[in-house]
Every structure is written in structure tokens, then in C-alpha cells.
Amino acid sequence: MMHVLAFVGASGSGKTTLIEHLIRLFKERGMQVSTVKNSHHSVEIDHPGKDSWRMKQAGSFEVVLVSDRSMSLQRTFERTSHMSIHEVIAQMYDGVDWIFV
């Protein structure tokens, strides 16, 4: 069963530091943790001109960057409004034990 825990506080109050510690602690206990970080800015992983950027610009719904040790998934939603946290979580992998927001 997946659990969701939200952290709320002023900037600089230690939310990220606490989350880092909890991720390590939960991982040591064999649990998988995902995180959601809200940003007030557009999220850009790619660099203009790179293949993955070009695929996204062409209209690909998902672009997956894969290397020997990692995978990064970027989805593009054509939305006019901000996604609710419930909508975000519904799009995430459901095989984790905890999601920290």
C-alpha cells in the first residue's frame, strides 16, 4: 500500500533536509520512496538541440532518457491549469511504499 506524506513550511525551514534523512532511513529499511517537488518555474531537463529536446519539441508525450544506470521520464501535458497533487500522484509509479511531497 502506498502512503503519501506532505511537508509544509517556509523556505529555509529544513523540509528538504528532513526529507533527505527520511529517504535514507526508509531505504535502509527496504522501502521505496518517491518524491514530488513543486516548482513555480517551467521544468526543463533537456538542452536545446539535443535529440531528446528535439523529440519533445516535435510533440512526443513522453521522452525517456536511458543510460546504463538510470532512466529519466519526462511527460508533457497540454494543460491550461495547474495539476492537483492527486492528479500528479495518479501519474506516478504505484510500486513505491511512500511518496513525499
Residue map of PLM features:
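Short loop/turn elements that form and flank the Walker-type P-loop nucleotide-binding site
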Residues: M1, G59-S60, D94-G95
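Walker A (P-loop) ATP-phosphate-binding motif of ABC ATPase nucleotide-binding domains
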Residues: V4
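Hydrophobic anchor at the beta1->P-loop junction of P-loop NTPases
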Residues: F7
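The conserved Walker
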Residues: S11
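Conserved lysine of the Walker
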Residues: K15
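Post-Walker A alpha-helix
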Residues: L18-I19
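N-terminal phosphate/diphosphate-binding loop that engages ATP/GTP or pyrophosphate donors
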Residues: I23-T80
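Phosphate-binding/switch loop-helix module in NTP-utilizing enzymes
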Residues: T76-V101
